[in-house]
Amino acid sequence: MPFCHNIINISCVKNNWSNDVRASLYSLMALIILTTLVGNLIVIVSISHFKQLHTPTNWLIHSMATVDFLLGCLVMPYSMVRSAEHCWYFGEVFCKIHTSTDIMLSSASIFHLSFISIDRYYAVCDPLRYKAKINILVVCVMIFISWSVPAVFAFGMIFLELNFKGAEEIYYKHVHCRGGCSVFFSKISGVLAFMTSFYIPGSIMLCIYYRIYLIAKEQARSINDANQKLQIGLEMKNGISQSKERKAVKTLGIVMGVFLICWCPFFVCTVIDPFLHYTIPPTLNDVLIWFGYLNSTFNPMVYAFFYPWFRKALKMILFGKIFQKDSSRCKLFLESSS
């Protein structure tokens, strides 16, 4: 049986997977990391370079892309080694730094999603006062909260060792070992992490997007009723309103679906594992962590790839046109359709 540390009686057990299995895992996780880095970097470069994209909403998306890029750059590579080897080769201090950074950036990404839902609510439901309510100052506050709260929560919990408060005996007797870097939560810290990083921002997203859907549906019905009264282009207008309603439902479904599929399994296991006496296998926990990482991989696709300006910006980046003079002033969309 292979071990992670020279002193066998205190060492974590290394997995005994074949080289082919290990190589396949490395390839898959490296692909996820590369996709995360490239997708979010394109969003960062696009919004930074093109002046037409310098809007409060886009700076919020830019900040989220930065969080997701850092997650792919600073966290995922080390998690890849830990997941493939079931060992941690980078020391106990760096384990704490890595775990804190992981929790911070993952939570910050979810916080950004929550604030973007608030932005979309005012854009759809209160368009006349949208620019007054969601200005650059408000967005700066959103960005500050999205970074600072997860940072204080993550680094405070890990470095003060609050994550296994009340379960020290279980942790040091049955979980802790040399050459490992597992994320451990007690009953209290597991519930706290679930509430802070998932339930509260997730509930905000769910309630707001459901409200947006109801209002969009009501607006589509009002347009349909007006068309029936006026009897002008009824069939065409009705088709358009139904198409818009279907598109709204599809977009909101994708947003919530990706978020829930990626993060719900991990946080549910995090909150129930202490109550099940830590019977969830570490391998399953690793898989669920990577499912959560996938949310940062998909964020550029869900929140940026759907924007009309993105395809043109992507084409200009790929063909090197952003290096041309005054390319930053290029019009990516008509002002009325932004």
Curated annotation (Swiss-Prot):
Record function comment: Intracellular G-protein coupled receptor for trace amines, which recognizes endogenous amine-containing metabolites such as beta-phenylethylamine (beta-PEA), 3-iodothyronamine (T1AM), isoamylamine (IAA), cadaverine (CAD), cyclohexylamine (CHA), p-tyramine (p-TYR), trimethylamine (TMA), octopamine and tryptamine. Also functions as a receptor for various drugs and psychoactive substances, such as amphetamine and methamphetamine. Unresponsive to classical biogenic amines, such as epinephrine and histamine and only partially activated by dopamine and serotonin.
One GO term (biological process): phospholipase C-activating G protein-coupled receptor signaling pathway
Protein name, as recorded: Trace amine-associated receptor 1
Membrane topology field: Multi-pass membrane protein
Name of encoding gene: TAAR1
Disulfide-bonded cysteines: 4-177, 12-87, 95-181
Protein family (similarity comment): Belongs to the G-protein coupled receptor 1 family.
Cytoplasmic face residues: 46-58, 119-135, 209-251, 308-338
Organism: Macaca mulatta
CDD domains found in the cross-reference section: 7tmA_TAAR1
Residues engaged in binding 2-phenylethylamine: 102
Lineage: Eukaryota, Metazoa, Chordata, Craniata, Vertebrata
GO cellular component: endoplasmic reticulum membrane; plasma membrane
A Pfam family the protein falls into: 7tm_1
Molecular function terms from GO: trace-amine receptor activity
Keywords associated with the record: Cell membrane, Disulfide bond, Endoplasmic reticulum, G-protein coupled receptor, Glycoprotein, Membrane, Receptor, Transducer, Transmembrane, Transmembrane helix
Classification via PROSITE patterns: G_PROTEIN_RECEP_F1_1, G_PROTEIN_RECEP_F1_2
Listed transmembrane segments: 25-45, 59-79, 98-118, 136-156, 188-208, 252-272, 287-307
SUPFAM superfamilies referenced in this protein's UniProt entry, alphabetically: Family A G protein-coupled receptor-like (SSF81321)
